[in-house]
């Protein structure tokens, strides 16, 4: 990677949303940059710049990785990412871009089996949204093979695990099941966010949890949930019944 992205804190309660605000700075660092004499094939210039900036960044208390999932297909923001879950945030690590999501910004987690597809989407609703440049992402959509089995070992102490479970996390040191289920349960347990699954609704054939529909020029699927509709896929939208 030849890019270092610096994210800046934004107070959404104090900034007039109509005004421009600096939310990030992206540095392009050529691999042969002469300002970093310590760089070589093992240490590219972008990593050298990152190492110099790291001591001046705000520590989010990430600590060690608690759980990780390799090469997850992500629909929004699009790409394949390694997902690392920490005690206070989870990170999306891709070939071109990385993202960090604070658990405090997660509104709710949804598990949505895709219609006419052997895939299941785990949707993470955010406020404030993820930002990259002028693009914002109100949702993170992670996609998994529905029947794929996986096992993870949570890297947490027994004491910390007990504290999480006292708050309703329902976690165990070893978690086994289908990939979307394990991912959603681990994220729910670590973040404390509520988890919503599809209910009793079925289509006219009695097979799918959603109905096909059109939004503007794109085809998608509408999931009738307990308190809202969820529209998948462009753009993903949560539509409360009260609205």
Predicted regions and their residues:
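Short, conserved beta-turn/loop elements at beta-strand boundaries and strand-helix junctions
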Residues: 110-116
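Short C-terminal beta-strands that terminate individual repeats in beta-propeller domains
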Residues: 102-103
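N-terminal recruitment modules of adaptor/scaffold proteins
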Residues: 5-99, 113, 121, 125-243
């Amino acid at each position: 990677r030849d890019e270092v992205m610096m994210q800046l804190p934004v107070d959404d309660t104090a900034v007039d949303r109509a005004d421009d605000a600096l939310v990030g700075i992206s540095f392009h660092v050529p691999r042969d940059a002469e300002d970093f004499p310590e760089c070589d094939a093992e240490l590219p210039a972008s990593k050298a710049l990152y190492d110099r900036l790291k001591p001046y960044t705000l520590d989010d208390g990430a600590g060690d990785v608690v759980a990780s999932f390799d090469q997850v297909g992500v629909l929004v923001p699009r790409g394949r990412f390694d997902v690392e879950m920490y005690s206070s945030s989870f990170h999306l690590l891709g070939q071109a871009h990385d993202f960090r999501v604070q658990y405090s910004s997660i509104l709710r987690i949804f598990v949505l089996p895709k219609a006419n597809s052997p895939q299941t989407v785990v949707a993470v609703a955010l406020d404030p949204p993820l930002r990259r440049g002028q693009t914002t992402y109100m949702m993170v959509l992670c996609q998994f093979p529905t029947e794929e089995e996986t096992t993870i070992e949570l890297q947490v102490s027994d004491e910390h695990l007990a504290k999480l479970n006292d708050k309703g996390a329902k976690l165990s040191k070893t978690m086994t099941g289908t990939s979307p289920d394990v991912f959603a349960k681990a994220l729910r347990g670590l973040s404390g966010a509520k988890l919503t699954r599809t209910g009793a609704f079925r289509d006219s054939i009695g097979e799918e949890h959603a109905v096909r529909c059109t939004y503007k020029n794109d085809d998608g699927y509408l999931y009738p949930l307990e308190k809202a509709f969820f529209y998948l896929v462009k753009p993903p939208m949560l539509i409360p019944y009260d609205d």
